């Protein structure tokens, strides 16, 4: 997840509405960065007949066929998809590829037309590829997007000859440094009073391999952005005024095969703004469109917090990828500053009945609150909580329900009798940074999804980019779990979550191995990876299994 004092923020501060802001493919010619970081740790544990731990325990797949069969975040075929963001174009949309194996991986990236890159990522190493934004999806750095669009053949197809994990960063940098060799930052526009040129609008997403995608998704995300006008005397939102609409929520659908027919049964707030051949559709209606492989549909709603695609049910006749986002948003309402949020939606069949939701690490090491949302997937879902139900959280859910608990300041466990989803959102810098100032503070909203306990893993290879001031891995584990991070025993970091049988660890990550890390555990664990920079943040699930453990919803 992102920041909200981008160029749009500066402009807005001068106005009434302010924003403080597939395996074995043939190599292709191209360019990129060869990874040079080392990942620590090889798995042990229960062995198969050949003396190896089976994939999904403490050993990642070593072939693309194994990766496809294992159905996890490890794979060989991915689709990177940039969407709407108010960040300046000079900051790079970037994919990061980590090689989970012991042999070099050749990774090809292709885009529209003749766009192509190739990198070799060494064993246990990381490679980055900086990619162009897609103009019709990104929008500009002030007004962003207000209509839907279809970008034909524009998704970035990432194909490796060996299993890897892939993340996308929108953008990667939070300040004007880095990028491809020789990159010029001279066009980066500084904010008034800032000591450097900052992006202020970042987030990141865990990408899922196409072999783990399905055609059924419960849309999980956020409403759009609104904020009350700024009181010039306090430079804060005026609580006596009504919120003004700022940015629209959206979801991105990327087709992996030609002739993919997509139907979306819209939720009660999911109005569609026409564009790109996608028809205007009222909330509660059905919108239908057809895509070919590599096409991206960015479906945009109305502007402001009265609009929300969450709870809508998307079905496609072939596997697709779905990402939800908002160009910039406050969490909670009127808390400075707004930031870009996005995350890949898990297939509906991979959602579970049991979650442990822990408060995230804050920018100064202490845990901080976050906003939690529940997404109903089946009628008649009854929820039970430990140690208690947080204020505002639901006791029951129906299919398509969306319930926002508000700001949650406790760790909790929740179980249901049917599958459901849980979203989490980092708060604005003025909430999470105790040293908050208008000119330089760490934090701002980011979107992630909790991973159900049934999809926990014992090995994670993950990325926490060293481009950020500070990054963490937050771990959920059961009693007696032994944890090793980059070869170091960190089991002592686990602390009990009162009233439950679960433990949480919040571990500050050293800026080593170009940000690539390996976590091993004696029992299945869940992880979230997050980090902070000046008026920005990112967060994503560090990985998960993607077994089909729930029936596809029918409404």
Model-predicted segments: where are they?
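Ser/Thr-rich, Pro/Gly/Ala-heavy low-complexity intrinsically disordered linkers and tails
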Residues: 2, 18-58
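Bacterial N-terminal signal peptides
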Residues: 8-20
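Topology signature of small-to-medium multi-pass alpha-helical membrane proteins
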Residues: 4-6
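Intrinsically disordered, low-complexity linker/terminal regions across diverse proteins
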Residues: 51-555
């Amino acid at each position: 997840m992102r920041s909200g004092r981008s160029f749009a923020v500066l402009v807005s501060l001068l106005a009434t509405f302010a924003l403080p802001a597939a395996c074995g493919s043939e190599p292709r010619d191209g360019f990129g960065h060869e990874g040079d970081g080392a990942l620590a740790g090889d798995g042990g544990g229960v062995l198969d007949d050949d003396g190896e731990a089976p994939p999904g325990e403490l050993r990642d797949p070593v072939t693309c066929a194994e990766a496809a069969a294992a159905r996890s975040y490890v794979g060989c075929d991915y689709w990177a998809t940039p969407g709407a963001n108010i960040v300046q174009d000079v900051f790079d949309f970037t994919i990061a590829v980590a090689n989970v194996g012991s042999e070099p991986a050749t990774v090809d990236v292709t885009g529209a037309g003749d766009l192509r890159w190739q990198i070799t990522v060494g064993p246990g190493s990381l490679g980055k590829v900086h990619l162009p934004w897609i103009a019709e999806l990104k929008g500009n750095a002030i007004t962003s997007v207000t209509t839907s669009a279809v970008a034909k053949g524009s998704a970035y197809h990432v194909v490796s000859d060996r299993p890897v994990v892939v993340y996308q960063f929108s953008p990667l940098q939070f300040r004007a440094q880095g990028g491809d060799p020789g990159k010029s930052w001279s066009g980066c526009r500084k904010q008034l009073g800032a000591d450097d040129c900052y992006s202020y609008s970042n987030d990141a997403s865990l990408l899922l391999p196409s072999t783990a995608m399905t055609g059924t998704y419960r849309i999980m995300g956020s409403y759009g952005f609104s904020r009350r006008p700024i009181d010039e005397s306090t430079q804060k939102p005026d609580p006596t005024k009504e919120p003004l609409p700022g940015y629209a929520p959206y979801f991105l659908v990327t087709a992996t095969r030609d002739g993919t027919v997509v139907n979306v049964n819209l939720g009660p707030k999911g109005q569609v703004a026409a564009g790109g051949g996608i028809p205007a559709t009222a909330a509660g209606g059905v919108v239908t469109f057809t895509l070919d492989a590599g096409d991206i549909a960015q479906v945009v709603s109305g502007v402001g917090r009265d609009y929300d695609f969450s709870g809508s049910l998307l079905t496609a006749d072939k596997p697709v990828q779905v990402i939800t986002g908002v160009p910039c948003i406050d969490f909670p309402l009127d808390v400075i500053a707004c930031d870009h949020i996005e995350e890949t939606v898990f297939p509906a069949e991979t959602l579970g009945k049991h979650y442990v939701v822990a408060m995230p690490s804050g920018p100064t090491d202490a845990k901080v609150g976050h906003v939690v949302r529940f997404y109903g997937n089946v009628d008649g879902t009854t929820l039970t909580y430990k140690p208690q139900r947080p204020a505002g959280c639901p006791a029951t859910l129906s299919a398509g329900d969306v319930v926002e608990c508000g700001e949650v300041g406790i760790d909790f466990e929740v179980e249901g009798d049917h599958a459901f989803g849980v979203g989490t959102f980092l708060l604005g810098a003025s909430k999470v940074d105790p040293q908050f100032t208008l000119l330089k503070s760490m934090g701002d909203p980011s979107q992630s999804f909790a991973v159900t306990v049934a999809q926990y893993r014992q090995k994670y290879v993950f990325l926490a980019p060293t481009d950020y001031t500070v990054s963490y891995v937050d771990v959920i584990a059961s009693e007696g779990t032994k944890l090793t991070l980059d070869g170091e025993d960190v089991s002592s970091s686990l602390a009990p979550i009162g009233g439950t049988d679960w433990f949480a660890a919040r571990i500050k990550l050293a800026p080593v191995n170009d940000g690539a890390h390996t976590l091993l555990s004696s029992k299945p664990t869940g992880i979230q990876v997050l980090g902070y920079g000046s008026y920005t943040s990112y967060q994503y699930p560090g990985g998960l299994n993607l077994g089909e453990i729930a029936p596809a919803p029918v409404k």
